[in-house]
Amino acid sequence: MAYATSTYARTSCIILPKIQNGAHFTDDTKAFRRITARRVTRIYASQGPTKPSKPSPGVDTRIHWESPDEGWIGGRSDPAKSVDEDKTNLLSDEKFAELIKDSFDSHYQFLGVSTDADLEEIKSAYRRLSKEYHPDTTSLPLKTASEKFMKLREVYNVLSDEETRRFYDWTLAQEVASRQAEKMRMKLEDPKEQDFRGYESIPDMVDRLGGRNMELSDQAMTALTFDILIVLFAVCCIAFVIVFKDPSY
């Protein structure tokens, strides 16, 4: 009996520690899982977003434009060529030609040629007018002929050179366009507003004379003298009646 009791006690002593060790092992496993999950989360957070994958070495990812000079800064463009193209487009514009034709008192009108005249027409007009305005062959007064001949040489120097003629045409078109814009603005404005803008106050007579008396004309002086004589005659008549006339009469 004693042997059986001691055996049960020894067995219970062996089983209880195993049960306690098993519960402790379960708790340790849960704690280890929590720690592992935290570490994995920290690793993922520290790595950040994933970078895009690089393209293959043989793949061209650039943007291709239809023109090699389009879409790129510092393309292969010639500044002189661009300026020449702009001038050509400007001179070939119909509106530009109309502006030059609408001008008045221009070099073309002085020569008597059209705005699109070529160099031969300009030379022919210059030779014709030089004979007319030259001081030795002119029928005009010498001063007038000299002024016109000097202007003729200036006009020919401007229109005979291609560059100076382009610049002159450009300035002439700008002048005509500005004048047309001013006319359009005047048409759109209110007439009453135009009258108000052009109104100038007329100062009083005293303000215009600066405080001085106005000078009288000869006719005004004659009329004033006649008025004074009439007043004096009336005064003399009254005095005569009062002094020399008999009161009984």
Swiss-Prot record:
Disruption phenotype: Malfunction of the NDH complex. Pfam families: DnaJ. It catalyses: a plastoquinone + NADH + (n+1) H(+)(in) = a plastoquinol + NAD(+) + n H(+)(out); a plastoquinone + NADPH + (n+1) H(+)(in) = a plastoquinol + NADP(+) + n H(+)(out). It is found in: Plastid, Chloroplast thylakoid membrane. Keywords: Chaperone, Chloroplast, Membrane, NAD, NADP, Plastid, Plastoquinone, Quinone, Thylakoid, Transit peptide, Translocase, Transmembrane, Transmembrane helix, Transport. Residues 44-84 are annotated as: Disordered. It is a single-pass membrane protein. Residues 1-45 form a transit peptide. GO terms for cellular component: chloroplast; chloroplast thylakoid membrane; NAD(P)H dehydrogenase complex (plastoquinone). Signal peptide: none annotated. SMART domains: DnaJ (SM00271). Part of the chloroplast NDH complex, composed of a mixture of chloroplast and nucleus encoded subunits. Component of the electron donor-binding subcomplex, at least composed of NDHS, NDHT and NDHU. NDH shuttles electrons from NAD(P)H:plastoquinone, via FMN and iron-sulfur (Fe-S) centers, to quinones in the photosynthetic chain and possibly in a chloroplast respiratory chain. The immediate electron acceptor for the enzyme in this species is believed to be plastoquinone. Couples the redox reaction to proton translocation, and thus conserves the redox energy in a proton gradient. Required for the accumulation of both the NDH subcomplex A and NDHS. This is NAD(P)H-quinone oxidoreductase subunit T, chloroplastic. It comes from Arabidopsis thaliana. The gene is ndhT.
